[in-house]
Amino acid sequence: MAPWLQLCSVFFTVNACLNGSQLAVAAGGSGRARGADTCGWRGVGPASRNSGLYNITFKYDNCTTYLNPVGKHVIADAQNITISQYACHDQVAVTILWSPGALGIEFLKGFRVILEELKSEGRQCQQLILKDPKQLNSSFKRTGMESQPFLNMKFETDYFVKVVPFPSIKNESNYHPFFFRTRACDLLLQPDNLACKPFWKPRNLNISQHGSDMQVSFDHAPHNFGFRFFYLHYKLKHEGPFKRKTCKQEQTTETTSCLLQNVSPGDYIIELVDDTNTTRKVMHYALKPVHSPWAGPIRAVAITVPLVVISAFATLFTVMCRKKQQENIYSHLDEESSESSTYTAALPRERLRPRPKVFLCYSSKDGQNHMNVVQCFAYFLQDFCGCEVALDLWEDFSLCREGQREWVIQKIHESQFIIVVCSKGMKYFVDKKNYKHKGGGRGSGKGELFLVAVSAIAEKLRQAKQSSSAALSKFIAVYFDYSCEGDVPGILDLSTKYRLMDNLPQLCSHLHSRDHGLQEPGQHTRQGSRRNYFRSKSGRSLYVAICNMHQFIDEEPDWFEKQFVPFHPPPLRYREPVLEKFDSGLVLNDVMCKPGPESDFCLKVEAAVLGATGPADSQHESQHGGLDQDGEARPALDGSAALQPLLHTVKAGSPSDMPRDSGIYDSSVPSSELSLPLMEGLSTDQTETSSLTESVSSSSGLGEEEPPALPSKLLSSGSCKADLGCRSYTDELHAVAPL
């Protein structure tokens, strides 16, 4: 060989040795540099290298940013998926590389890289969001994509990875996974590395529950291993990162205990690791909910008892409130025991004392509520004040037998006291009648019996004034609190006036003033106080009736004006032909009775002249009776039934047009059946004296001048026969103004 050839070979050999050592150092250094560089995350980085195209830049995060993965287009699976494995901090780290598919690449906004252990539930996720360029095209289909490194992976463990493009119409489960297995420790690290040597694991790892605490006990390694403390990693099964608890190794015992306090119940993954990461053991433990001592019956009792106590207090409060309301309403019922005993002891003596006779006059033009008040007031006078009351609503038999006007005159003459219940209707019609009478005209309201009664009472009042002032005490005018003193007619100004129920004690004393010598001083005043009158059922019934009248007035303040406002009379109706009867001149009463049960009453009575009589005789008869015949022949404008003429004709009438009793009582209901509440409140002894069959009472105030209606049980033959010799009361009514 030529010398120059030998010289060249030696030169190349030396050069190769020198360059080889440098290349080896460079290769090792670059590997270590790569390991140091790839163990950390990059926020933004290029996704392709040496592709000949523009770089694609992604923004990386750990799937915390929520982007809707569902789209409207199909994006193909990732292509050419490869796994790059290397060691980071003595553990396995991998990087995923792939290329995008051509289908739907123009709609691609990013990727999600999901890494899971095959036989465990651990899951790691990375999200790559396309930053530059904003949109890809088919020229990028061979561009390589690269994920961030996945750290802290186990040696020789099976994993799978999914690269899911988004937004895609396909679901995550529709993309195929890529399976791989991590390499062994000695392939990724040096064989003499401690991490690759077999490591010691505790033989026993015990977990126990103490209330809401969890205690982990394990036997530690021998002292020659050099372990100073252990790390206890724990988390719920479906939570994210582990929580760590440091447990110091106990030197005096062979076991070490670590207490986890106030842990929530659930399924836990517990991992024991030593300080050099050479000892690791994993366990699963289910921590049960803690049953409080207040659970079960104790809790039920603890809940029920307060509810019962609260309900009891609420019930007691309600009862007290209602009792207070009742005390406010019936405050007059509260009487001292001594006063009650005095009142009870006084009752037998009062039964022996004569009961003053009282005649009650009232208006029938103030509605049914006012009539209820009057009826309750009559019962109250009889029950509580110890009076014998004459009320027409109670004695229809006497009215039918004697005649209404005759009955009124008789009761005015017999009664010791005459009480006129004044009201708006009475004031209006009495004043109107007097005005029409003075003016010579004939007004509405004629035929009402209370007008006749008031006129007779006024005449008696004038006579009493002329005789003696003591005789005036017989006449009393009362009005309730829904009326006023102005409702007292002017012709009754001489009478004693009382407002009820404010002046109830004075009224009771007035009614018993004639037997002051028999009673103890102040007895009736105490008995008739506002507090005492609620003690009886009749008093409470009167209270209710007054309240009903107040309510009616509040609902219709102008009820009286609506009912009695003057209006143009309607056209005269056709009147049925009159059948005249002529006979011997005697006056007979023909009573037409409505067939029905025993409670029915006589509906219509008219007088007939049975002989030819001249007009002068008729006029003479009417003047003596105090009647206005011409006014009687016309119907009243206020809607009340007209008086039937005493000496005229007989006309046939059907049951439908027969006049009723104008408010004294309803002919369809027996007067013995009272429609007001609590009327049974009369005491036994007073009920005996005020029974409907034996009482002298009947009202003067509400009836019309009709022949009296007899109960049908008294009319066995179907007709009523009146006395032929009807005596006249012209001597009693000689000064009464004609109606």
UniProtKB/Swiss-Prot annotation:
Known glycosylation sites: 19, 55, 62, 80, 137, 171, 206, 277
Top-rank taxon, per record: Eukaryota
InterPro entries from the UniProt entry: IL-17_rcpt-like, IL17R_D_N, SEFIR_dom, Toll_tir_struct_dom_sf
Membrane topology of the entry: Single-pass type I membrane protein
Ranges for domain SEFIR: 355-509
Biased composition (Low complexity): 667-702
Sequence intervals crossing the membrane: 300-320
Keyword hit for Cell membrane: yes
Cellular component terms per the entry's GO annotation: Golgi apparatus; Golgi membrane; nucleoplasm; plasma membrane
GO biological process: negative regulation of epithelial to mesenchymal transition; negative regulation of transforming growth factor beta receptor signaling pathway
Record note on what altering residue 306 to S does: In HH18; reduced activity
Signal peptide range: 1-16
Topology feature Extracellular, residues: 17-299
Cytoplasmic topological domain residue ranges: 321-739
Region feature (Disordered): 614-635, 650-719
Expressed in which tissues: Expressed in umbilical vein endothelial cells and in several highly vascularized tissues such as kidney, colon, skeletal muscle, heart and small intestine. Highly expressed in ductal epithelial cells of salivary glands, seminal vesicles and the collecting tubules of the kidney. Isoform 1 is also highly expressed in both fetal and adult brain, pituitary, tonsils, spleen, adenoids, fetal kidney, liver, testes and ovary. Isoform 1 is also expressed at moderate levels in primary aortic endothelial cells and adrenal medulla, and at low levels in adrenal cortex.
Effect annotated for changing residue 162 to R: In HH18; results in decreased expression at the cell surface
Disease / disorder: Hypogonadotropic hypogonadism 18 with or without anosmia: A disorder characterized by absent or incomplete sexual maturation by the age of 18 years, in conjunction with low levels of circulating gonadotropins and testosterone and no other abnormalities of the hypothalamic-pituitary axis. In some cases, it is associated with non-reproductive phenotypes, such as anosmia, cleft palate, and sensorineural hearing loss. Anosmia or hyposmia is related to the absence or hypoplasia of the olfactory bulbs and tracts.
Subunit and partners: Interacts with MAP3K7. Self-associates. Interacts with FGFR1, FGFR2 and phosphorylated MAP2K1 or MAP2K2. Associates with a MAP2K1/2-MAPK1/3 complex.
Protein name stated in the entry: Interleukin-17 receptor D
Organism in which the protein naturally occurs: Homo sapiens
